Design a protein with these regions (language model features):
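Transmembrane helix-loop-helix hairpins at the membrane interface
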Residues: 132, 136-263
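Membrane-interfacial entry segments at the cytosolic side of transmembrane helices
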Residues: 49-55, 122-128, 195
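N-terminal, membrane-interfacial amphipathic/helix-forming hydrophobic leader that caps
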Residues: 1-119, 253, 257-263
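Juxtamembrane helix-loop-helix connectors linking adjacent transmembrane helices
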Residues: 74-169, 187
């Protein structure tokens, strides 16, 4: 049995504690927790194969519902009120979510294999490679499409944005898209000659489609960025994918229009 990824769990728990200082949980949130526990028990047991499949199916449904904020009992606090970080940017606001991080807790506790432990040296190399590629593809593409421009800044709310993005956004998204989806597909497609490449591309495409509400440009850019994150995960594990994703978000936030140009 794989050891639990305590460092990842500790970081996510710290972020969740930060979110609780801005929002709160209602008793109805207990229903979601109970369903996740049921899914986890079913997915972890080894006696009934169909039970494992049903457990993962229930988790996928819950992950979608939590990510879309469909479930009751979660009162997410707003950490940043609507404002423009630069005069030419669209207004940005930020909530510290209490529902979406439960996806990360479930994955780290039920599927610790998603971590893909690698050496520190390999992780650093994979992060540097993934970040360089994703920055060239995604930020370069965003500049070419005219959705961002050069706009270096460090607003007063930057530190809160940083903690939220690292602990509650990037960690959870990479655990889901790279660890669970790419890692799971890689395991099931390993008999194919290009199974790992196909898993990476499918996970990147799903990650891009998750940004559909922002427009086709962001679907394309997120898909391209996902290729860099996926390579970081393949060679450096979950920590490298998180570092790559967060590094790109930090470059976008600190050096370019955030979140995008108005109009």
């Amino acid at each position: 049995m794989l050891a639990l990824p305590w460092i990842h769990l500790a970081l996510l728990s710290f972020g969740y504690g930060l979110a609780l200082t801005y929002g709160h949980l209602g008793w109805l949130a207990g229903i979601s927790v109970a369903l996740l526990l049921t899914a986890g028990f079913a997915a972890r047991q080894q006696h009934v194969r169909i039970g494992r499949y049903l457990g993962h199916a229930l988790f996928i449904f819950m992950a979608l519902a939590l990510a879309m904020h469909w479930l009751p009992g979660f009162y997410n606090g707003r950490g940043i009120n609507p404002q423009r970080f630069t005069d030419d940017a669209v207004r940005f606001s930020m909530y510290l979510n209490l529902d979406k991080p439960l996806i990360g807790f479930w994955l780290l506790l039920v599927c610790p294999w998603i971590v893909g432990q690698r050496s520190l040296r390999l992780g650093i190399f994979a992060t540097a490679m993934g970040l360089t590629l994703s920055a060239l593809l995604a930020l370069g593409g965003a500049l070419l499409l005219g959705v961002i421009s050069w706009a270096p800044k460090w607003p007063d709310q930057a530190w809160l944005w940083l903690f939220n993005n690292l602990l509650l956004v990037t960690l959870v998204e990479e655990a889901l898209f790279r660890g669970y989806i790419q890692g799971g597909l890689s395991r099931h497609l390993k008999h194919l000659p290009y199974g790992e490449n196909l898993a990476l591309l499918l996970a990147s495409l799903l990650f891009g489609l998750a940004h559909l509400a922002a427009g086709w440009q962001w679907v394309l850019l997120a898909t391209l960025a996902g290729v860099g994150y996926g390579l970081a995960y393949r060679f450096g594990g979950l920590a490298a994918a998180i570092a790559t994703h967060f590094g790109l978000n930090l470059l976008h936030f600190g050096l370019f229009t955030y979140p995008m140009l108005a109009g």
